[in-house]
């Protein structure tokens, strides 16, 4: 195991391909100690309020996340200690009672729409990536994902996108692009960018 694990931040708009890019990196190093942690896992617990109120929460605002807890757990992993990561229930709009045990790794991919927005998170990262995808593609992907995986109606997805997701993208997510070391147009289909990133990671891991 490396003396200091590598932390890679991957961000971009909802439906922009962050997870696909993260998994492409993950799958490129099958023999390495590497894991992905999603900022979504750290949405705040909302079990104390009604379901109707949870639905109204702005999930694209920094205040929706317990980023303090995420930072605390990342520091534990950096120190070589395992953590129990929360598991978020998208259909109930709150944390579940379950957690996932994450052991320390050599490479930790931190993925989420706002992971470059918080300076404290950025300071923990060795490589910062922004996945830059066209707005039309992102909304189509979001509709497909939320209807199939999260059981949501088309009407609710479009309403949330126009009233919350799009404004928050321009207020918080897009401005964080200036902090990225690498901007990846077209996401995982940008093979050249993915190869360059993997080469950098491999050089750090000593696999070249």
Swiss-Prot record:
GO terms (BP aspect): CTP salvage; UMP salvage
Cross-referenced SUPFAM superfamilies: P-loop containing nucleoside triphosphate hydrolases
Family: Belongs to the uridine kinase family.
UniProtKB keywords: ATP-binding, Cytoplasm, Kinase, Nucleotide-binding, Transferase
Binding site for ATP: 12-19
Disulfide bonds: none
Keyword Nucleotide-binding among record annotations: yes
Pathway membership: Pyrimidine metabolism; CTP biosynthesis via salvage pathway; CTP from cytidine: step 1/3; Pyrimidine metabolism; UMP biosynthesis via salvage pathway; UMP from uridine: step 1/1
InterPro entries referenced in this protein's UniProt entry, alphabetically: P-loop_NTPase, PRK/URK, Uridine_kinase, Uridine_kinase-like
Family matches, as CDD domains: UMPK
Catalysis performed (reactions): uridine + ATP = UMP + ADP + H(+); cytidine + ATP = CMP + ADP + H(+)
Gene Ontology MF terms in the entry: ATP binding; cytidine kinase activity; uridine kinase activity
Cell compartment(s), UniProt: Cytoplasm
Main localization, broad class: cytoplasm
Domain of life where this protein originates: Bacteria
Pfam families (UniProt xref): PRK (PF00485)
UniProt protein name: Uridine kinase
Gene Ontology CC entries for this record: cytoplasm
EC number(s) recorded for this UniProt protein: 2.7.1.48
Top class in the EC scheme: transferase
């Amino acid at each position: 195991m490396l003396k200091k694990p590598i932390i890679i931040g991957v961000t971009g708009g909802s439906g922009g391909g962050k997870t696909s890019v993260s998994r492409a990196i993950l799958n490129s190093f099958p023999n390495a100690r590497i894991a992905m942690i999603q900022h979504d896992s750290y949405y705040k617990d909302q079990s104390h309020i009604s379901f109707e109120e949870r639905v109204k929460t702005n999930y694209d605002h920094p205040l929706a996340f317990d980023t303090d807890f995420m930072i605390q757990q990342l520091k534990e992993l950096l120190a070589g200690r395992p953590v129990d990561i929360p598991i978020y229930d998208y259909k109930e709009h709150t944390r579940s009672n379950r957690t996932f045990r994450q052991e320390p790794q050599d490479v930790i991919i931190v993925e989420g729409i706002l992971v470059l927005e918080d300076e404290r998170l950025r300071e923990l990262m060795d490589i910062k990536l922004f996945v830059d995808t066209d707005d039309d593609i992102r909304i189509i992907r979001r509709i497909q994902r939320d209807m199939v995986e999260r059981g949501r109606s088309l009407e609710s997805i479009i309403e949330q996108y126009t009233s919350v997701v799009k404004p928050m993208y321009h207020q918080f997510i897009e401005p964080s692009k200036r902090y990225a070391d690498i901007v990846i147009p077209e996401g995982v289909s940008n093979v050249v960018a993915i190869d360059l990133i993997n080469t950098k990671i491999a050089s750090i891991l000593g696999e070249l």
